[in-house]
Amino acid sequence: MAEYTPTEHGEELKADGTQKAEDRVNNRSLRPNSDSFKDFMTNNWDNQEPEVKALESSKYIPARLEALSKRFPGERLVIPAGQPKVRNNDCDYAFRPDTTFAYYTGLGQDYEAGAVLVMEPVSEDSEEAKAGKTHVPELFVAPRADNSTSAFYKDPHYGEYWVGPRAGLKELKAMTGIETRDIAELDDAIAKNVSDDANGEGIRVRIVRETDPELTAKVETMREASGFTDEDANTCADDKLHEFAAEARMLKDDYEIREMRKAIAATKLGFDRMLTRLPNALGHEHSERMIEGAFNSVAREEGNEVGYDTIVASGKHAPILHWMRNTGVVSSGELLLIDAGVEVNSLYTCLLYPSPTPRDG
């Protein structure tokens, strides 16, 4: 069996100094390793401080968190943002945070992959409890990988050489109004005092299950080791957390109403652009995609992204419920079905438009 020697960065080299084949795909973020290269990459940069201000949504977060806190007093609530999903090789799909996370932090758009919101129950004799609080919200995030660290150029997920200046602990606290902690502290924070102690000294943990499977598995293992051995009961408890969050979003606050109106206006503009594009698209080999592209460009100009993949279904594709390949030809005198919506931050619209296309002549 071949012997491998780990380097300071975790990659393994064979005895002859060559790299394992499966590690070669990561070369761009791991090598070279010399001190002179590190000095070159981390020195003489201009100011990399991101511009930070409180998000408009941050004014509405305390009320949302208070309602959540009152529903689950004395319990630790874990709400992940989710992890990036690989598209191919070392390239990820554009990140979109879980809706529950976005609702309770105000962080929409592409904030913040890997982050976790924890509602930490307060002790009865604490100052927070005396002030009427039942939880303290804590946002666990990755620190900035700026040019003072080697991760600046080695980490393609967080390194600011790769992704530009990003929000870290200080910045996300200013943006959300929520206290932040290093993500490295998360495991210990979640496991603290977890127990099914009959005397009421232990803490139950609930998690939004489907968002981050790896984190959910850790929570399940921790709960089982702490006496919460009924898997069905644990799942049911988690489902109640998700259910409450989903129902809470049914009643929109003023901020959400403004965002919905922005999304509606942007979606209307997108449909206008598609209809303007339609005459030139008729009969073209890629006409469904030409119309799709017209809408998607508005989604990026006026919002954050499309709320879901745009459906442009013409002729025989029109009866298909979720036709998103959009490979067909839009012909004259056929039924054209468009289902599209713009997402602004984390709220989006859904507009279904069935119509015959113009006939020739």
Model-assigned labels for residue ranges:
Residues 1-270:
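A composition/biophysics-driven feature that prefers long, compositionally simple stretches
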Residues 82, 315, 339-341, 352:
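Anionic group-transfer/hydrolysis microenvironments
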Residues 87-89, 344-351:
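Short, Lys/Arg- and Gly-enriched loop/turn segments at beta-strand edges
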Residues 104-111, 120-121, 318-347:
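Acidic/histidine-enriched ion/cofactor-binding microenvironments in catalytic or ligand-binding pockets
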Residues 252, 256-278, 283-299, 308:
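Active-site pocket-lining segments that scaffold enzyme catalytic pockets across diverse folds
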Residues 288-291, 314-319:
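Short acidic loop-to-helix transition motifs that present clustered carboxylates
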Residues 305-316:
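Short, basic/aromatic beta-hairpin or loop at an interaction surface
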Residues 353-361:
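Single conserved hydrophobic/aromatic residue that forms the stacking wall/gate
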